[in-house]
Amino acid sequence: MSNKAWGGRFEVQPEEWVDDFNASITFDQTLINQDIEGSIAHATMLANQGIISQQDSEQIIQGLKSIQHDYHQDQIQFSASLEDIHLNIEHELIKRIGDAGGKLHTGRSRNDQVATDMHLYTKKQVQDIIALIKSLQSVIVDIASNNVDTIMPGYTHLQRAQPISFAHHIMTYFWMLQRDQQRFEDSLKRIDINPLGAAALSGTTYPIDRHETTALLNFGSLYENSLDAVSDRDYIIETLHNISLTMVHLSRFAEEIIFWSTDEAKFITLSDAFSTGSSIMPQKKNPDMAELIRGKVGRTTGHLMSMLMTLKGLPLAYNKDMQEDKEGLFDAVHTIKGSLRIFEGMIQTMTINKERLNQTVKEDFSNATELADYLVTKNIPFRTAHEIVGKIVLECIQQGHYLLDVPLATYQQHHSSIDADIYDYLQPENCLKRRQSYGSTGQSSVKQQLDVAKQLLSQ
């Protein structure tokens, strides 16, 4: 007799190396808890519907729980010849409780079984990711709250542009993560759907109750079409997309952390606990954690592209290609959860070099726009003011000084309306104070922004 659940129709058994190629047990045992949870719900429903006896159902449930316990105690070895987590568990169950174990699969296919497992797994992981995002956001808000008055150069094209609040800069990532969190939250509506009971593709002749298993498994709804239930992998693609975009945001933040920690910038100092050294250069302190996060974006995005390509030509309903949905998702989940934890610890322990930042904006031309705006207050058209300031900046560059160092007489040679109040006007802290538009870098606006962020985190 064949050891395959489908062996009755076959005359020749596959060789071991073919089994190894076909099997998914090396990675889909990640789903053991979800598989057993789904099977317990299915067995409970089968008994309640009179499809199997209560005694058989109780035996099945106790057997499943013992398998789960023993697995987590490293007391079970699964076999590639049994292909996957579903058949390995069923084989072990029958071995433990006898024929009653063979009744578990009544009214069910591996097609709806694996779909149920993946929905349960993805739902739990997305909920975990949301919690990790919120935790990182909370740290960002704490850092920002302590740095409302810390001034730094804002950049465009990686060239110094205008002075901004460090709090305003770092809060940008709060809002990126807020959108990421919202996307994950919204996706739960499409993840939290029960496919169990769809069977292979067309439903089942047994009088099952899909609403009961939906309630037992805490799903928000159930699939209305059995064919769709076993064919749908949209929720996996959506999750991979949301993971990839969140990783892109972490990567952008990581790039800035890397730049800020250079000797050239010295805006921050990373903790030794989140840095590494060199095997040849004794002086080195490298931002490896930030670099790894930046590098892992290619990994998660690759999984997204792989899944899109896997599905693009598949006919309905289940095809073995769908086995490829798991490793990429498992790895992407592991990657983003690790990256979020590392990022939180990395920025929570970094030192912000406030004096260095505040001094930096006095040694550049990031207040040049302020000078142009000053001229506008003297009824000079902005385009004319822009031209005047450009010439002043060029002269400063040629003479090796900055706008705060320009003698008043020199200013007045460029335009007679410039008065002695220009020096106070160009001070970086005053540049920020004048930024009062909603969402701007001014202190009062940043404090308002922080209040909104704290309110969101408390929800």
Curated annotation (Swiss-Prot):
Its EC number is 4.3.2.1. Its main location: cytoplasm. It catalyses: 2-(N(omega)-L-arginino)succinate = fumarate + L-arginine. GO terms for cellular component: cytosol. The gene is argH. Gene3D superfamilies: Fumarase/aspartase (C-terminal domain) (1.10.40.30), Fumarase/aspartase (Central domain) (1.20.200.10), Fumarase/aspartase (N-terminal domain) (1.10.275.10). It comes from Staphylococcus aureus (strain MSSA476). It is found in: Cytoplasm. This is Argininosuccinate lyase. InterPro entries: Arg_succ_lyase_C, Argininosuccinate_lyase, Fumarase/histidase_N, Fumarate_lyase_CS, Fumarate_lyase_fam, Fumarate_lyase_N, L-Aspartase-like. Pathway: Amino-acid biosynthesis; L-arginine biosynthesis; L-arginine from L-ornithine and carbamoyl phosphate: step 3/3. The keyword Lyase applies. GO terms for molecular function: argininosuccinate lyase activity. Pfam families: ASL_C2, Lyase_1. GO terms for biological process: arginine biosynthetic process via ornithine; L-arginine biosynthetic process. The keyword Amino-acid biosynthesis applies. It comes from the Bacteria. Keywords: Amino-acid biosynthesis, Arginine biosynthesis, Cytoplasm, Lyase. Belongs to the lyase 1 family. Argininosuccinate lyase subfamily.
